[in-house]
């Protein structure tokens, strides 16, 4: 059980606003009011929420209103998050924390930051100018109202700005890193052709070029980016149809699940209004043979979803699309990085993008009297994670799915 190091707040004289029973004791400009809002109230709060996303310490496209509201509306009622928001003394929104309570029968006793099944991150949006105070106000609110042993901050970038702020807040609390891994990312600088050798995949780069030539012999190949709301609407339908034509048709294609298909249509359209989404396509004589949905926030991009025509597997259209996306991203400038949103050791993207970003799940205890319960909760959470990973490995061996 690890604890993040920090000088004791009482010794340093530093004070964070604390809310117990709704009492405001903070300075007017400090985060002082934490409250739970319904989905309807969050919808009405969309303009303030969008403004917060632009001021956020750590960007997260999956917690912006276009994505989060669409996801919450179209998931089963039992899986919908509770939205905890923090405001400062002037009423300005400084934090949005969607949470889900542990299952009373089979849960591990930890409140979780909401990670939708279609999301790759669960980093809360907090104002960069008062991030530690906002995080503390959230923890105090939960501690005063919930019986859970701790809060699980799931899927956040390791050593990212939010993670660093969390480290500064949790002195005196028990902390456990329940999971951590690295996934492929595209960092700025250099040329696309230089990435293969850096990844130790020089032969793979040569194979990509050979497959591109073979694809070009079949017809006119074009790479297109769709970013207006009208273009996104049409491209989303093409994506859903392309995805459903392949192996995902029997392993959970979005088009086969009406709620998820509606969610994707809604999220991409709403994000496009804020320049937060684009859909890229590789086309053969005008027909889409590979498509990717890319989310964007504060200079970061998220390669969220990819679909490709499996009848052209020998020409690897999915890899050709990622390679074209890589060139476009590196040539575009103003890039923080592109998150692959992939699993660790992904057999395709890892051979193209040599850089990695860390992602971690960090559990933080609530209350000094709950440490034993917190440790037990962490043990249960680890046991459940290991069981899920074992089940996934077994399923993948049985299915023997190929990646292209």
Q: Which residues make up each language-model segment?
A:
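Active-site/acyl-donor-binding loops of N-acyltransferases
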Residues: 2-33, 164-194, 333-404
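A conserved beta-strand-loop-helix scaffold within acyl/acetyltransferase catalytic domains
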Residues: 31-112, 155-183, 190-314
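Short, high-confidence coil segments that cap the C-terminus of an alpha-helix
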Residues: 79-81, 146-150, 277, 333-338
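Aromatic (often tryptophan-rich) hydrophobic motifs at membrane interfaces
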Residues: 88, 127, 133-140, 254-371
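A gly/proline- and charged-residue-enriched helix-loop-helix capping module
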Residues: 116-147
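Short, solvent-exposed beta-strand edge segments and adjacent coil->beta transition regions
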Residues: 119-121, 220, 359
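Short intrinsically disordered coil segments
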Residues: 139-141, 198-206, 376-384
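ATP-hydrolysis module of ASCE/P-loop NTPase motor domains
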Residues: 143-161
């Amino acid at each position: 059980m690890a604890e993040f190091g920090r000088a004791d707040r009482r010794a340093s004289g530093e004070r964070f606003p604390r809310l117990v029973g709704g009492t405001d004791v903070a300075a007017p400009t400090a985060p002082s009011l934490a409250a739970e809002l319904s989905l309807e109230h969050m919808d009405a709060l969309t303009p303030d929420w969008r403004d917060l996303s632009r001021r956020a310490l750590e960007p997260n496209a999956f917690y912006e209103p276009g994505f989060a509201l669409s996801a919450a509306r179209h998931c089963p009622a039992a899986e919908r998050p509770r939205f905890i928001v923090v405001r400062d003394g002037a009423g300005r929104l400084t934090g949005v924390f969607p949470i889900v309570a542990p299952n009373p029968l089979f849960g591990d006793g930890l409140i979780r930051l909401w990670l939708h099944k279609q999301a790759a991150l669960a980093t809360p949006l907090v104002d960069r100018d008062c991030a530690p105070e906002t995080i503390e106000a959230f923890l105090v609110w939960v501690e005063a109202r919930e019986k859970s042993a701790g809060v699980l901050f799931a899927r956040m970038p390791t050593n990212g700005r939010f993670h660093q702020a969390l480290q500064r807040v949790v002195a005196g609390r028990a902390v456990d890193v329940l999971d951590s891994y690295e996934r492929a990312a595209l960092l700025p600088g250099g040329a696309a052709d230089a990435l293969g050798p850096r990844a130790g995949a020089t032969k793979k780069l040569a194979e990509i070029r050979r497959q591109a030539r073979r694809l070009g012999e079949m017809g006119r190949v074009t790479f297109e980016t769709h970013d207006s709301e009208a273009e996104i609407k049409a491209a989303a339908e093409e994506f859903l149809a392309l995805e459903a034509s392949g192996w995902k048709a029997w392993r959970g294609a979005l088009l086969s699940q009406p709620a998820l298909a509606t969610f994707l249509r809604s999220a991409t359209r709403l994000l496009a209004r804020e320049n937060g989404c684009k859909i890229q396509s590789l086309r053969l004589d005008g027909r889409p043979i590979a498509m990717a949905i890319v989310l964007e926030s504060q200079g970061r991009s998220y390669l969220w979803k990819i679909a490709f025509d499996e009848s052209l597997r020998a020409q690897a259209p999915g890899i050709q699309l990622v390679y074209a996306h890589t060139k476009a991203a590196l040539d575009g400038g103003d890039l923080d990085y592109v998150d692959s949103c992939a699993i660790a050791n992904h057999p395709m993207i890892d051979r193209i993008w040599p850089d990695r970003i860390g992602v971690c799940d960090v559990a933080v205890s609530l209350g000094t009297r709950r440490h034993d319960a917190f440790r037990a909760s962490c043990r249960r959470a680890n046991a459940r994670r290991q069981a899920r990973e074992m089940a996934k490995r077994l399923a993948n061996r049985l299915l023997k799915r190929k990646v292209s």
